Amino acid sequence: MTIEKPKISVAFICLGNFCRSPMAEAIFKHEVEKANLENRFNKIDSFGTSNYHVGESPDHRTVSICKQHGVKINHKGKQIKTKHFDEYDYIIGMDESNINNLKKIQPEGSKAKVCLFGDWNTNDGTVQTIIEDPWYGDIQDFEYNFKQITYFSKQFLKKEL
């Protein structure tokens, strides 16, 4: 008899839900699909800690990089709410500022594990642990974010499923 593992829900977080977290959501979904693991997830989503870009499509550079790599991205910005801490198993931030903001609003006793996406870095020198905000940077910064997020997504799937 095979025991079926419970499905999990994952939310990716950045400041505005405009550059990094929508990219993370899209890449993670892409990697889940490639690995044929859709049946292991209830929800995969992304949010911002702020309301700067609620209802907006992601930054055009995020969309461009995803499309160049064959990753579908279709998202409108949303802000994380306290209720989400009981709807998701993992709430994953891109940098320390995201984690600090999340911990300020996380209700005591909620089920979500708040963690840094870089926690899945194997520290073998492939990528840096912190996914820096590319907002003020150029397209190479978005490309590097793509590399980091792809790497962390693959590591998450290896270690958590």
From Swiss-Prot:
Alphabetical keyword list: Cytoplasm, Hydrolase, Phosphoprotein, Protein phosphatase
Phosphoserine PTM sites in chain numbering: 57
Source domain of life: Eukaryota
InterPro entries for the chain: LMW_PTPase (IPR050438), Ptyr_pPase (IPR023485), Ptyr_pPase_sf (IPR036196), Tyr_phospatase_low_mol_wt (IPR017867)
Catalytic activity: O-phospho-L-tyrosyl-[protein] + H2O = L-tyrosyl-[protein] + phosphate; a phosphate monoester + H2O = an alcohol + phosphate
EC number: 3.1.3.48, 3.1.3.2
Compartment(s) where it occurs, according to its Swiss-Prot or TrEMBL record: Cytoplasm
SMART domains: LMWPc
Main location: cytoplasm
Pfam families, per database record: LMWPc
One MF annotation (Gene Ontology) recorded for this entry: acid phosphatase activity
Cellular component per GO, a single term: cytoplasm
Top-level EC class: hydrolase
Annotated site location: Important for catalytic activity: 21
Catalytic site: 14 (nucleophile), 20 (transition state stabilizer), 133 (proton donor)
PANTHER family for this protein: LOW MOLECULAR WEIGHT PHOSPHOTYROSINE PROTEIN PHOSPHATASE, LOW MOLECULAR WEIGHT PROTEIN TYROSINE PHOSPHATASE
Similarity annotation: Belongs to the low molecular weight phosphotyrosine protein phosphatase family.
Task of the protein: Acts on tyrosine phosphorylated proteins, low-MW aryl phosphates and natural and synthetic acyl phosphates.
Further facts: Present with 3500 molecules/cell in log phase SD medium.
UniProt name for this protein: Low molecular weight phosphotyrosine protein phosphatase
Top-level taxonomy: Eukaryota, Fungi, Dikarya, Ascomycota, Saccharomycotina
